Amino acid sequence: MIDSDGFRANVGIIICNRYGQVMWARRFGQHSWQFPQGGVDDGESAEEAMYRELYEEVGLRPEHVHILTSTRSWLRYRLPKRLVRQDSKPVCIGQKQKWFLLQLKSQDSAINLSSSGHPEFDDWRWVSYWYPVRQVVSFKRDVYRKVMKEFAATALSFQTQEIPRKRGRQKTTG
């Protein structure tokens, strides 16, 4: 769904664990990392799109997560000119996103990047809460800063345990 201003309706998903960390995923075959996100289909609510994208991108079902909150309004970013497909109609100049903060209720092993058969991501890890703001591709940075600021009090209040000392291989950064 592309609106009259050229922005595609999209949902963004931030998954947090009991340590106050967030899931950070690497785009398939690329060196860029981001939160899961995806388009809202015609006739689909933002929440329905979030659950669909959650399964398609990271293999999680509604029973694996709890919705903590969502953004009060849609947040927008423009695509760099080199990424705008001028030959498509209507032309999409960026994304308008409704963001959801989810708490993971299941074990990390429930995360499956290949659940849809067309993986969006090829790796993931837990990172400190503010890490993504510094690391995301530049044209998404302002939206990430806004959403992380809006969600900070809620996300960080759900930290129920200290991060364990490293024992063996762990997927953590930041």
Swiss-Prot record:
Taxonomy, superkingdom: Bacteria
Motif stretch (Nudix box): 38-59
Protein name stated in the entry: RNA pyrophosphohydrolase
Enzyme Commission code(s) on record: 3.6.1.-
Keywords on record: Hydrolase
Pfam families linked: NUDIX (PF00293)
Keyword field contains Disulfide bond: no
Function: Accelerates the degradation of transcripts by removing pyrophosphate from the 5'-end of triphosphorylated RNA, leading to a more labile monophosphorylated state that can stimulate subsequent ribonuclease cleavage.
Database matches in SUPFAM superfamilies: Nudix
Domain Nudix hydrolase as annotated: residue spans: 6-149
Keyword Hydrolase applies: yes
GO MF, any single term: mRNA 5'-diphosphatase activity
Cellular component, GO annotation: cytoplasm
Cofactor(s), by name: a divalent metal cation
Similarity comment text for this entry: Belongs to the Nudix hydrolase family. RppH subfamily.
